[in-house]
Structures are given as structure tokens and as C-alpha cells.
Amino acid sequence: MLKKLFFILSKEDKNFLFFLLVFSVFISFIETFAISLVMPFITLASDFSYFDRNKYLISLKEYLNIPVFEIIVYFGVGLIVFYVFRALLNAYYFHLLARFSKGRYHAIAYKVFSKFLNINYEKFTQKNQSEILKSITGEVYNLSTMISSFLLLMSEIFVVLLLYALMLLINYKITLFLSIFMVLNAFILVKILSPIIKKAGVRREEAMKNFFEILNTNLNNFKFIKLKTKEDGVLSLFKAQSEAFSKANITNESVAAVPRIYLEGIGFCVLVFIVVFLVLKNESDISGILSTISIFVLALYRLMPSANRIITSYHDLLYYHSSLDIIYQNLRQEEENLGEEKLSFNQELKICNLSFGYEGKKYLFKNLNLNIKKGEKIAFIGESGCGKSTLVDLIIGLLKPKEGQILIDEQELNANNTKNYRQKIGYIPQNIYLFNDSIAKNITFGDAVDEEKLNRVIKQANLEHFIKNLPQGVQTKVGDGGSNLSGGQKQRIAIARALYLEPEMLVLDEATSALDTQSEAKIMDEIYKISKDKTMIIIAHRLSTITQCDKVYRLEHGKLKEEK
């Protein structure tokens, strides 16, 4: 567990974790010292004669030159001040504990999200979107809870060990008996409850995975659900997983309460036993054992919550262990390491003996060859599933050939120059996603807003008239997924987004297939008009959209056949 946790945490986090562990040891000494002070205080307060019998107390009384009761009062006040200091120190420690454990949610979520953004495209296409969302949200939060439980476990172990040492010094016989009795009961608790917690943790992880899957799938098919009136069926699926998730958490919470209830009862019985044992042993001098009884009462008062926290924290480690495994596996994914080498595209792009197949599947292409000249407009046609989009993904550098190479002006496309090459490409997909922000933000897509460039691409994409009639202009919100816009308006925003990057190559992946023939023809005319000097690659189903292309290739059985 520690190996995986240290892999996930940064160097700064590990250093702070070490500091917290050292601080917890210091807190443990303070706790033990605070309890140890109670015994002499009660002893002296119950019998002033100690100041006449103990040479150190005699010297102290002579040095202070004040009545004994005043010494006891000052001792009591000092004890109160020390306990207040102890309480403040504990509060500060738990603040640091919460800041570290819950603060890791941000740091680890950022690392996991960054990892997903930086894995290669082929690996990403094999991921389940709901799994990614679950990892970044639920599993990372669970891991932060697990870290908190781990630190609390270590802190309480230190407290228990030091208090145990103190109790051994006071009365080793009672302490040894107490140890055997408590360890035996704790062992029974752990053996009985741990399997229940583990099974609940597995059920929680499985239910959570299905929970996110159902949400993701059905929210993306809302129109179909409404049309087919499938609400009841969807709710039934959601209810089953939501209940499974709740039941797993109920089991965990219920089992977590058992150690406290059980140990409180056992602790009370042990306390009564200690008092009875000491009274029977010292029948003639009850006042002499008052301090011993007091110290054991205080020690047990502090040990019972510690024992409960240790068992509960251990159960949390078991319950959330799957979250640690999931985050660890996510962060171990190999990243796409791209260099900053420049790549010029002034003459032509060559595909030489290219072969490709997705991992674990047969090759889609074998020994494919193709030349695309700078400024040329080409189209790929073919049956659905023949590999048109995959071929384009290879051409634009998202996928890497298994065999063969892609040459840009006779320079091989590789990890060193792919990043620069991708920046030369404007991409308009079939399924356009607009986020719930302004038109301007959707066009610039995270880049700084250049008003001159923004106005130019709005004009090029024929959005000028539409935006002028909007009360808020380019600051108008488009709605989630562009729900406030028509299909044609979304398409034009996607075109403006692609043009804003000032690309040298424009790629349309069935970008107008969702439009009617008239709208499609109009938008394609606009695209051809504004892309005179750009290289264009088009994937199309309708031949009417590619009449102005220089070349048309049909992809069939992994082979390209020129049709124009």
C-alpha cells in the first residue's frame, strides 16, 4: 500500500507527510505527559504530608516559601494551562491533517486528469468516459479519505504505545492483563469485521462504476429516452445501482460504529475490574491507590477512542483500497512524450507503405501509399467502418503507424515534431461539442481572445449576420452542447473554431452529414471559398460535398482507389 501511495504523492507531499508523522509523535508525547501529570497532582492534593516526607518537595516548599495549598493551586492552574495548550495543539494538528488529506484531492485529481490528457490518442479511445469521470471525481476523493485514515491510524498508534509504556511503569501486572484482554478483543473485532468491509468496498466500487456508466449513457441519449418514453426503465437501472452503492456505504458506516460501542462496553468493564482489584489489594489504604486509579481512568478514557479510531481507520484502508489501486494504475499509464521540433509543410505529404491496426485487432491497412500536395483538396469515401476516420487520424498525427511512415516535405513525422505538426491542422468533426459558454469562448477554445482574428473568422464562417442580431453578440451563451443553436449555427461556429487557429490544413470528418442538402451545399461552398490556399482533407458520405475536390479516393478492404 505504501509503495503505491508514495508513487502517487509528489516529493513535497511526501516531505509534508513525514512532517505530520513526526508531529504526531510529538503530540503523542504531549498526550502522555499530560496524563502522567494527573497522578502526582491527585497524590499531592489528597495528602499534604508528602511535602514533609519527600526531600524534593521539602526543597521546593522551602524555595517557594508559600503554604502547601498555594503550591497545589498553582500546580492545578499550571495543569489547566497545559491541558488547554494540549487541546490547541491537537486542534492545529487535526487542521494540518485535514489540509493535507483533503488538499490531496485537488493535487491528485489534477495529476489524474493531466495523465488522461497526455496519454496517446489510441489509448484514450479505448477508455470508458464514465470510468474517467469516476476516477477523477469519486476515486480521488476516496483516496484523500484513505490518506486521512492512514495518518490518523499512525497518530493513534503512537499515542497508544506511549500511554501503554506509562501504564507499564505504574503497574505492569494490571497493564499486561489489560493488554492481553484488549488485544484479544480487538483481534476478534478485526477478524469478524474486515471481510465484511472488504466485500462492501468491492460492491461500492462496482456500483459506483455502473452508476457513472448509467448517468453518462442516458444523459447523452436524453432525446431518445423522451421519444421512446423509456424514463421508467432508465430510472429502474439507476435505482438498482444507486441502492447498491448506498447499501455498501450503509454496511461500512454500520460496521464502523461497532468497534466504538463494543470497546466502550469492554472499557467500562475493565475499569471496574481495575478499581475492584486495587481496592481488594489495598483494603487498609484506599487513599494510597486513588492516584493509581485516577491515572488508569484517564489513560483508559484516552485509549478507548484511540483503539476505536485505529480499528475504524484500518477498516477505511480496506474499504477504499480499490480506489488506491485504480488511481495507481491510472497514473502508471504511459504518456505521449512529444518534442518541440519544428516541421514545415510547404510541398507535399507522403504516406509510404503504411500499415495500421488497433491494439489487439487485425490491421485495417497494409502497405498503403498516398501523396497529398500542399494546397490540394482531397476526399475519402467508402462504406461505414472501412477506416476513413482512422486513416485521417493517422494523417493528422493522432495515431501512429504500426509499419511504414508519413513524410512531410521528406521529413518523417515522429514524436519530436508531431506537436508542431498538429498545430498546423484545423479539425471539424462530425459530432460538434460546444460547451456552455459564450460564442467567443467556443470559437477561441481556451486561447486568448484576439478581437481582430475573432471578427475575421466570424465573417469567414458567415456568422456575422447571425451574431449581430443577438442582444449580447459574441458573448451570447450557446447552452450545454450548443442547445440554444441550430445545426447550421453550430456547424459555422465549429468552422470558425478551426479557422481561428489559422491552420495550413483543414480536415472535415463528415462535418456536414447532420445538415440538410441545401445547408450542406451552402456551408461547403463557404469552406471551399475560405480555404483556397489551404490543404483540405474531407471524409464524406454525400458525393455532392466533394465536387470541388482535386482528388477523390475510395477506401475499400484496406486499399485506396482513386476515383477522380
Swiss-Prot record:
Location(s), subcellular: Cell inner membrane
A single Gene Ontology CC term: plasma membrane
Residue spans crossing the bilayer: 16-38, 77-98, 150-170, 174-197, 255-276, 293-314
Gene Ontology MF annotations: ABC-type transporter activity; ATP binding; ATP hydrolysis activity; ATPase-coupled lipid transmembrane transporter activity; lipopolysaccharide floppase activity
Subunit structure: Homodimer; domain-swapped. Helices that arise in transmembrane regions 4 and 5 from one subunit cross over and contact the nucleotide-binding domain from the other subunit.
Region named Important for stimulation of ATPase activity by lipid-linked oligosaccharides and subsequent translocation of lipid-linked oligosaccharides: 46-67
Annotated pathway: Protein modification; protein glycosylation
Protein name: Protein glycosylation K
Superkingdom per UniProt: Bacteria
UniProt-listed CDD domains: ABC_6TM_PglK_like
The EC number(s) this enzyme carries: 7.5.2.5
Gene encoding the protein: pglK
Keyword Translocase: yes
Domain commentary: In the absence of ligand, the homodimer has a V-shaped structure with a large cavity that is accessible from the cytoplasmic side.
Keywords per UniProt: ATP-binding, Cell inner membrane, Cell membrane, Membrane, Nucleotide-binding, Translocase, Transmembrane, Transmembrane helix, Transport
Cytoplasmic side: 1-15, 99-149, 198-254, 315-564
Chief localization: membrane
SMART domains linked to this entry: AAA (SM00382)
